[in-house]
Amino acid sequence: MKWKEFIINQTKQDYLRNIIQKVNTIENHQVVYPLKKQRFRCFNFFDIEQTKVVILGQDPYHTPKMANGLCFSVDLGNNLPGSLVNIFKALEYDLQIKRTNPDLSDWAKQGVLLLNTVLTVNAHQANSHKDFGYDQLIKNAFIELKKQKHVVYLLWGKQAMSYIDLIDKDHNLILCAPHPSPLSAHRGFLTCKHFSACNDYLIKHFRTPIKW
């Protein structure tokens, strides 16, 4: 099944219809990010069976022109947010790759699910939609993923780690680290070497590694 089919099926369920309706109502008087057409963008790139890596973020960037529907990613031409700066620092420390392109869609095209735990946010109000019920969507996505083997889960931060019990630990790789936010990255994220560990695992299980 394609991830696109999954999200279409979810939008037919009451919980997600209620969330969408609530967000639409807020948009009558408040700017919401990302743009409506980008809110389920992370599900547009590949089939569920093609999922190699899951990176679980928190909520979208709440400043203008930043959130683009892929966790941690921003479009070309924007300044790099602090979290993305630290992700690139960790990548360089690990694999000596000096990445400058902030648009992570090339990762998504290789089977990396760049999923936030909350898919919308009010402008300039971090975590403003955290209690809207998106956790049900994340749980349902993880239930679908349980049918897959040899997927690498990169869980950065406590919010991402809260979903660890939904993962089949016997047939997948789980890598945990502090969130890449400037507030916490120095606690071990910058030297976690998750990118090489991820690719080593994929190669071991005869899957194509990610070109980070």
From Swiss-Prot:
Name one molecular function that GO assigns to this entry.
Answer: uracil DNA N-glycosylase activity
Q: Which UniProt keywords apply?
A: Cytoplasm, DNA damage, DNA repair, Hydrolase
Q: Which SUPFAM superfamilies match?
A: Uracil-DNA glycosylase-like
Q: What domain of life does the UniProt record list for this protein's source? A: Bacteria
Spell out the reaction equation it catalyses.
Answer: Hydrolyzes single-stranded DNA or mismatched double-stranded DNA and polynucleotides, releasing free uracil
Report any one BP term from Gene Ontology. Answer: base-excision repair, AP site formation via deaminated base removal
Per the UniProt entry, the Enzyme Commission number(s) are 3.2.2.27
Q: What class of enzyme is it?
A: hydrolase
> Any idea where this protein resides?
Cytoplasm
Please list the residues that make up the active site: D59
Q: What is its main location?
A: cytoplasm
Which Gene3D superfamilies does this entry report, sorted A to Z? Answer: Uracil-DNA glycosylase-like domain
Q: Which InterPro entries match?
A: UDG_fam1, Ura-DNA_Glyclase_AS, Uracil-DNA_glycosylase-like, Uracil-DNA_glycosylase-like_sf
Summarize the protein's role: Excises uracil residues from the DNA which can arise as a result of misincorporation of dUMP residues by DNA polymerase or due to deamination of cytosine.
- Give the record's family classification: Belongs to the uracil-DNA glycosylase (UDG) superfamily. UNG family.
Q: Which HAMAP family match?
A: UDG
Q: Which PANTHER family match?
A: URACIL-DNA GLYCOSYLASE
Name of this protein: Uracil-DNA glycosylase
Q: What species does this protein belong to? A: Ureaplasma urealyticum serovar 10 (strain ATCC 33699 / Western)
